[in-house]
Amino acid sequence: MLKLFDFTTVALTNKISNVLFSKEAILAYIFLLIGIIAAIVIFVMINENKRNPGAEYQAFNRKNTSITLSNESGSRFCMLSEIDEGIKEAAPIKYADEITLEQICHDFRNYAAKELKLYYEIEDIRKFVAGLSVSKLLILQGMSGTGKTSLAHAWGDYLNNPSTVIPVQPMWKERTDLIGYYNEFTKRFNETMLLRKMYEANYSKNIYVTVLDEMNIARVEYYFAEFLSVLELPNPEERYLDVVSDKWESDPKGLVDGKIKLPKNMWFIGTANNDDSTFSISDKVYDRAMVLDLDKRSERFFAPKTEKLRISAEKFEELTENAIRENSISQRNLNRLLALDEYLKEHFHVTFGNRIMKQIQIYIPVYISCGGDELSALDDILSKKVIRKLETQNPIYLKSSAQGLKNYLDELFGKDMMPLCKERIQKMERNA
């Protein structure tokens, strides 16, 4: 019986060996090897695309791209070199000269309604325009479907220079996710649409709008950190971002020692959702940005036919500077601010700080020039910049001290004259 088993085993082994070394088996091995190699190539390509998310939003904005992607110059910066060539043929642009901030607000609101079927309250448009005068970063936050991205897109459309919409990706962590990186294998720089627009803006007087769509799906303080730091520099001529670590003779003319100038005519508008899929925005970002809350849809209204506006960034900044001179915050409200600052320091160990005071002194005059009133502007910016800081307080202490703060606001500014501040305090009370 044992001999029969051994004989059967040997015979089976021989058959297996014959199959393994048959032509069919060899071909199967070859096809399997080809399949493995193909899988590796596909895996590498997928990871390359993940590393270069700019390819996604380049396609998203392809209709706004007027240059070709050829690389006849031999430069490692294909798109930027094309801009250098194309700018020589650009025709001069005639900009509007006689216009006011209030007119801009009304015309933009009417244009969005008539041409784009987007409806916004005039107060929100005033806050939007005044916010742009304070910071190069404006955050639009609120419930989904309230028109955050649409508002930012409409602003670029109204200004005759379409906004560049960049869908932020969850894995973004650094500057290269926004502007691209140098590919050692191809010896080319993987340029993004944002890099192209930044380079183009340095040649132009137009207002450029970059929309960071769903900006807090990744940590803003990570991927936008260098932008925030550079924007803090008081002199716009010193605002440069690193692109590459060295300089090549064939590099585009606008790059200085591998750095690109952050254009003073570019604004960043981020849209933010507050849900489980997003990160909270840090104080570092909030302190440097302006915020507009869009929490409800506006009613439809009749809007007359309104033309687009051609206004230079220089003219827009001139209008804001004129507003600051003509509508400086009243001494009475300055005294109220000082008193509120003392109250908050005593009861909550929170203070305004120089940055917030500077923002207040810009925001209020511009909001007034947009057609609003001083106290409404003060209520709005205090609720976002000062009262919001109380969210970090001990919940039990905050709940017990909230009524005293609301009473003090009534005493200082008049009963129910600060509705936005009191509404935010009440919301914090409920969440405590």
Language model: regions and residue ranges:
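Long, low-complexity, intrinsically disordered N-terminal extensions of eukaryotic proteins, enriched
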Residues: 12, 47-51, 55-59, 416-432
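Compositionally biased amphipathic helical and low-complexity segments enriched in hydrophobic
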Residues: 3-5, 13, 70, 81, ...
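Intrinsically disordered, low-complexity coil segments
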Residues: 23, 116, 369-372
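Generic cytosolic/nucleocytoplasmic N-terminal low-complexity/intrinsically disordered segments
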Residues: 2, 14, 62-63, 174, ...
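Alpha-helical lid/collar subdomain of P-loop NTPases
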Residues: 76-89, 306-432
